Regions:
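Intrinsic low-complexity, intrinsically disordered segments enriched in polar/basic residues
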Residues: 27, 34-54, 60-64, 134, ...
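Helix-loop-helix
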Residues: 1-42, 86, 195-197, 211-213, ...
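General structural signal for secondary-structure boundaries
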Residues: 4, 62, 66, 78, ...
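Juxtamembrane extramembrane loops of integral membrane proteins
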Residues: 25-116, 171, 175, 573-577
Length: 577
């Protein structure tokens, strides 16, 4: 090779090196490290590093990596209180079982209506005006990631693990333009912390989280579901409810909302938004056609939605729990106001406090607790009962005189002014003998608030739901039936009717009028008709009360014999003639 050729070769080599270096400097950049896989089910379609969404504000990540799962998977989080089953398809809740409770068919109570949700969507589905985007986010396969603080803080694939609180579970979906992330944190109680965010490009978009298909015990009859299911919303100080039957069309209730959700007779599912001023509450009914149901029977479950009004993450807590005063009072803010004892809450709620004390400290049987509390109530009312019986005996003494006055005016019509004169004469007799005509009614009047209070307490307190007493009485919140040869016999109602009859037979009556006496003796049959469909705990209360009064009346009759009737005054006798 000559010198010129060598120079040309060296020049070419030098220029090649220079071009290579310049190309590297100006046209090539350092490739980023390969991102860590979120789970074996994830498939990353880009080498860009994963961008984490900002916790606050409306700005979303600048870059959105593609992050989608390969196939639907199920993930279960289970504690002593609940078992929640998630699906990675849509990052929704397919089942939320309250482990300590059974439904009407004696199966573990699932608050999610699975068959309805297969058609209508599952809890934690998102809703938004863009139908295509809504479908994409509810049908897409999310990538799950779990974090257990007590195990070193390393994220792992939850599909291959059994999760138990304390744990957090995050689902992420992205197609490169749209990203959705749902994060759930679980603790030892009934509260689940949730964070749902959807971003498009570099901006968050408003999102609504829904609970379709209704809530509660779905094994009840359609009539019971329709009457017992409510939407509840507002604040703990000012709570509003709307019956499911009253929801005719989609309604959005504006904030501020401290709480919003659904409830049935014994269970509640409540959203507690972190920012009450930035949410609304949406209610609607959904058409659902179960197999083998007629058009008339076709149910229309209630759907509830927590609406985010701002383009920002939607942060809230979910409380899916029994409507127990103790459980709901432990929530922050306390939710015990959800337990509605009705107009007689001032009696029903205080009645439950000693009843629960007796159950927890004396005897672990709700039926015997009712018996003991009833004995205590009747013992406390004994002085009033004695006073009432004394008043009844005094009225018996003057009964012939009263009868003479009534016979004197028996031909007078009701609208005749002389009827007023008759009443004045009767009241004069009572006054002369120091008798209060209403005195004998006091015990009955005092019993009525307790009766209604017990009714409301037994109808609302979840502690008495499926509570066993003895033998055939297995549910104090349900009517008493002993099934013999396929026929349900209301044994407690029969015993109550007999006891009430004997109690009235032993109690002196304040009247000698045969028609009124017959009417009073018919009262036990009226009570039987009234109590036939009531809870067995209610019948047990009245039966025990009647038995206690029989014992009391036995000793009263021995030590307080009835007084002899006064002779009819001559004036009354002459008037009769």
């Amino acid at each position: 090779m000559n010198l010129d050729q060598e120079k040309r070769v060296m020049l070419a080599f030098t220029l090649s090196i220079a071009v290579f270096i310049l190309f590297r400097v100006f046209f090539l950049k350092e490739p980023p490290p390969e991102p860590k896989k979120a789970s074996p089910a994830a498939t990353a379609a880009t080498n860009a590093p994963k961008a984490e969404a900002k916790p606050l504000g409306i700005s979303a990540p600048a870059a959105l990596p593609v992050l989608q799962g390969a196939k639907p998977e199920e993930i279960v989080v289970e504690s002593k209180l609940y078992r929640i089953k998630f699906s990675t398809q849509g990052a929704v809740i397919k089942s939320w079982v309250l482990k300590k409770y059974l439904d009407a068919s004696d199966q573990p109570l699932d608050t999610v209506n699975g068959p309805a949700c297969e058609s209508l969507g599952f809890p934690m589905s998102v809703d938004m005006p863009n139908a295509t985007l809504k479908s994409q986010l509810n049908q897409g396969i999310y990538v799950p990631e779990a974090l257990e603080p007590g195990k070193g803080g390393a994220a792992f694939n939850p599909v291959e693990s059994k999760l138990a609180p304390p744990v957090s579970l995050t689902f992420t979906y992205s197609d490169g333009k749209i990203q959705a992330k749902k994060r759930f944190s679980f603790g030892a109680d009934y509260t689940v912390k949730a964070d749902v965010r959807v971003s498009e490009g570099q901006q968050y978009v408003p999102v609504t989280v829904t609970w379709p298909g209704g809530f509660g015990d779905h094994t009840l009859s359609p009539a019971l579901i329709e009457s017992a299911r409510l939407a509840v919303y507002g604040s703990t100080d000012h709570l509003s409810t709307t019956a499911q039957s009253k929801v005719k069309e989609e309604t959005t209730l504006p904030g501020p909302l401290q709480l919003a959700g659904m409830e049935d007779k014994y269970f509640a599912g409540i959203f507690l938004p972190d920012n009450p001023d930035q949410v609304a509450f949406r209610l609607a009914r959904q058409e659902w056609s179960p197999p083998n149901w007629t058009e008339k029977e076709k149910p229309r479950p209630l759907i509830a939605g927590l609406v985010g009004m701002q383009p920002a993450p939607l942060d809230f807590r979910m409380v899916v729990a029994p409507k127990s005063l103790e459980v709901l009072k432990a929530v922050s803010p306390p939710l015990d106001s959800i337990v509605d004892f009705g107009w007689f809450s001032m009696i029903a709620k205080p009645l439950f406090i000693p009843l629960r004390y007796i159950y927890e400290h004396w005897i672990h049987n709700w039926g015997w607790a009712i018996v003991i509390l009833t004995i205590l109530i009747n013992s406390a009312m004994l002085p009033l009962r004695l006073k009432s019986l004394k008043s009844a005996q005094e009225m018996q003494k003057v009964a012939p005189i009263i009868k003479g006055i009534q016979d004197k005016y028996k031909s007078v019509k009701l609208n005749d002014p002389r009827k007023q004169k008759m009443n004045e004469e009767i009241m004069k007799v009572y006054s002369e003998h120091g008798i209060n005509p209403l005195g004998s009614c006091v015990p009955m009047l005092l019993q009525m608030p307790f009766l209604i209070g017990f009714y409301r307490m037994l109808d609302v307190a979840i502690e008495l739901r499926h509570a066993h007493w003895i033998l055939w009485v297995t549910d104090l919140s349900a009517p008493d039936r002993l099934v013999v040869a396929g026929v349900g016999i209301p044994v407690l109602v029969i015993l109550m009717t007999v006891a009430t009859f004997f109690m009235q037979k032993m109690t002196p009556m304040a009247t000698v009028d045969p028609s009124q006496q017959r009417m009073m003796m018919m009262m036990p049959l009226f009570y039987a008709f009234l109590f036939y469909r009531l809870a067995s705990g209610m019948v047990l209360y009245w039966l025990t009360s009647s038995l206690v009064q029989i014992v009391q009346q036995y000793f009263i009759n021995r030590h307080m014999p009835p007084s002899a009737a006064l002779p009819v005054q001559r004036k009354a006798a002459e008037a009769k003639g």
